[in-house]
Structures are given as structure tokens and as C-alpha cells.
Amino acid sequence: MNPILVLLCVIALGLLVGRVSFRGISLGTSAILFVALLAGHYGWTIPTGFGTLGLALFVYCVGISAGPTFFRGLASHGRAMAITGSVIVLTGVAVTWTSARLLGLPAELAGGLMAGAMTSTPALGAITQSSSDPAAVAVGFGVAYPIGIIAVVLFVQIAIKLFAKPGDSDGTDSASETSGQSSAEIAESNSIGRRVVRIANPVVSGKRPSDIVAFADSPCQMSRVQREGRWRPTPPDYQFEIGDDVMLVGGASEIRRVSETLGELQDTAEPVVDADRERRYVVVTSPEIYGRTLKELRLRSKYGVTIVRVQRHDVEFVPSARTRIEFGDGLVAVGEPDALAKIANAVGHRPRTVNETDLLSLVAGIVLGIFVGNLSLQIGEFSMSLGIAGGPLMVGLILGHFRRLGPIRGSYPPAAMLLMTEGGLALFLADAGLNAGANVVEVLMERGAMLCVAAAAIAIIPLLVGFAGSRYFGGRTLWQSLGATCGGMTSTPGLAVLTGATDSSQPATSYVAAYPVALVLITVAAPWLVELIG
């Protein structure tokens, strides 16, 4: 069969299998590896080079995506969650090394087990490219990956049942170290709603929304005021008056919290608004906007608009005054038509700038990353290099943070980023699985039970250490600790279980702080661990 056709068929079938969901859990793009292992077992092959190209593209895009939050998280209040993520990764490294020594596992097989148990495809790529036996790495990953996913999901469910107290699911978020961090108010889009509140508290009468502490601390926005029977965007000079009906946008728990300060929630029909003329989606490209909080920008007083939602990395959330706007954020603004035109120009919304993909910058960035990855540092008899995975990852992180290095741009449209990330990962997984498929049955027959035991240990022990450290030594809440633990394990399914169990923004807040640090650390540490074991 034509090798290119084999590659495309494996990817297509893998993506179809990845869509199969059982109780909310699916393999996603990683299912391509399992289909490729099966195809490789029956002798299907593809030309060399596809996997290397796919890996370089994948990790470079991962770096670009993580760059804006990675360095800021290390230097901000999210540091505590980043430490939790680091502890989890280092514990995973230690458990992997111990398991390899006790069970006599080959270094490459042990490295694949760690990447799978920690559900980290970038780590799989880093080990594969630096390994002398990439087939063993792929087999180890294939065995451990399902175990890693199930372990995190079950751990989160059990922890919630054991430690959650009545009322915890209401998600009342106290001020915490993560409250001022970028993306701190992320919430699942299906939990965002609108409610009408009637002003009844004399204390707020005559005050502006910006004067109310509840708005500053909560991911909840007041978008409209009812005037003469019509819902109008909140004017810049609006002051609360007893009897006013206002519209709040946010999660159910946050709306309840703010309404307790303002007055009484109203059980009314869905308000009718002029969304076509009084709401606009704009994308941030102006350096005068990104990197600053909504409180610092004062968009309502300057332009007469309210930012009711922010879309970042395919996640939509309601911001608070402390939310820091980032380059490429999609903002949903509510205001009068002329005010919306002004805010569109102010944030730098230019369709061509937002939607164009600079291919020259993409190629130059990957080439620079490969060059950096080939540089080696000699320490005695031990030689270290970032390799084909670590080099593009580091360059991507730097470009993602600074957005530009000379002529090389570090930002791409969200749709293009998703396509390049998923496309690169698909090429790499297909190549790795097809090359490893010939030996998969032999390895499983020889070490199957042993591999499952090691994978379970590598997945479970870091979970326990990370959660206990954050909860009992770090003094974090249950939701913060579980969010950071899922981030340290780079487990999106675990986060999905958390966000389904609470309206609180704390799980996603902590996940966002821990995830990029854990992702980078495990990608860099994984190939060095293999050398250490070997």
C-alpha cells in the first residue's frame, strides 16, 4: 500500500477512535498511537522523517501556547501552584527511576512508562528522539497512558467524596494567591449565564459598579441596565439607584454572591437585548491593551463598554477587575454601537493581523529551535542537550512570551495554532506507533504485568504527594489542590471532572498555574532520566 495513504489512514482511524467516549473519558489524538501500534504489528510502514517534522512542529506550538503564562506564573502569585506541579513531576521521575531499578526495566521502556503515566505526549517525543530504542518508548507509553488517565480521574472523584464539605460545590472563592494571576477566572462556558438583580441595598445606592468590592473580587460583570422598559448597555457614569434592574453575567455562584451585596435576584423571563448592535467580538493585538488588568484599563469609563467574556485558548470565561488581558484574547464587549467601534480600534482588532499566519516566522522559529536543541553542554563525562523536542519547545516559550524576536513573530491565529499542534502530534504519534508495532506483542508478553504495576505506581504516587503537599503543607483549598494536581499531571480529563463538580473557578485557576511548568519540566527532564537509568 502507498506509504502516504497508510499514514493518512492511520491518522484518520486514530482520530475516530479518539472520539469514542466512556463516562466522559476519551483518548483524543493519542488514540492514533494505539491504532499505529496495531498497524505496525501487521507490517505497515511509512517513510522516515514524518515523525521528526511532526514532533518539532508540535512542541514548538506547545511552547508558543504556554509562553505567555509560563514565565508570568513563575514570577506571580501562581508560584505556589507551579511548585506543586514541579513536585509532582520530580516525584514521577523518582518513582520511575526506582521502578526501573527494582524491576530491571530498560531505560527506554521506563521513560515511555513515565510519559504515559503522566499523560505527557511532549515527554514521549523528547524521549523518542534522544533514545536508541524508540520502539520501546512507544510501547511503554501505550501501556501507561490509559492507566494515567484513569488514575487521575478516579483520584479526583475519590478526593471530592472524601474531603469535600457541604457547600464547597457552591464555589465561594476566597481571596487567594492565585486571584491576581492571568486566566484566574477561567470557568467552563456552559456554566456562564445571565440573571436580573433588583437593587435593594441602600449601602450601594449612589455608588458606581467599580466602587463595589464584590465586583473586584468576583468573575462577574454587570452588562446592562433597564431603562424605560429596554435593556441598555451600562453607561460610563452609571450609579446604582434603589429599584433599578441590572443584568449580571457570570457563573451561578458568582452571580448569587454579588447579588447578595446589590439586592434581590429576580425570577424573570430571559431578557430581550439587541445583541446584533450592542455586542461585538474583538481580538486583542494592541500592546497598549495586553499585559494590563481590566481595572487598569478602565474600559467602561473610557469607552463606555463592558467586557463580559474572554476567550483564551478555546476556553471562555467571565473576567473580574483583576483579570490580565493577553495578546490574542477574544473579548466579548457590550456597549452602544459607537462605543463598540472605538473599543475595536483601541484593542487593535485588525482582521488581517489577527487571522494571518506568518509561515516564514514559523519555519524560522522551528529552525532556530532545532539549532538550539543540537547544542550540547559537557559536564565531565555527561553530555546534555535539549534535542529535537526540547530546543523548539524552549524557543517557542521565549517567542510566546515576548511575541517577537527581531523579525520572527511568536503569535499565530488560534485556528492555525490548533491545526499545527494537532497535525504535528498526529504525524509524530503515527510514526512512533508504526515503528514500534513490530515489537509490541513481544514486549507485552514478556513484561506485561510488570509494566502495568510500574505504570500504576508512577501515576498514583505523584498524585498523592502533590495533593498532600498542596493541601496540608501549602495550606491550599481542596479545589486549588486538586486543580494544581491535575495540572502537574497534565491531565485535562481530571480537570473536566473538577469543573463538573463545582462552580468555583479555583480548579481551573490552579490548573493553569501548574500545567505549563509541569509540561516544560517533564519534557526537559524525561530524556535526561533515560540517560540516568541507562
From Swiss-Prot:
Gene Ontology process terms (BP): potassium ion transport
Biased composition (Polar residues): 172-187
Keyword Repeat: yes
GO terms for MF: monoatomic cation transmembrane transporter activity
KW Transmembrane (keyword) present: yes
RCK C-terminal domain segment(s): 180-264, 265-349
InterPro entries noted in UniProt: AAE_transporter (IPR050144), RCK_C (IPR006037), RCK_C_sf (IPR036721), YidE_YbjL (IPR006512)
Gene3D superfamilies: Regulator of K+ conductance, C-terminal domain
Places the protein is found: Cell membrane
Predominant cellular place of this UniProt entry's protein: membrane
Region (Disordered): 167-187
Keywords: Cell membrane, Membrane, Repeat, Transmembrane, Transmembrane helix, Transport
Record's bilayer topology term: Multi-pass membrane protein
Bilayer-crossing regions: 4-22, 24-46, 56-75, 82-104, 134-156, 359-378, 382-401, 408-430, 445-467, 479-501, 511-533
Pfam families, alphabetized: Asp-Al_Ex, TrkA_C
Cellular component terms per the entry's GO annotation: plasma membrane
Similarity field: Belongs to the AAE transporter (TC 2.A.81) family.
Official protein name in the record: Uncharacterized transporter RB4869
Native organism taxonomy: Bacteria, Pseudomonadati, Planctomycetota, Planctomycetia, Pirellulales
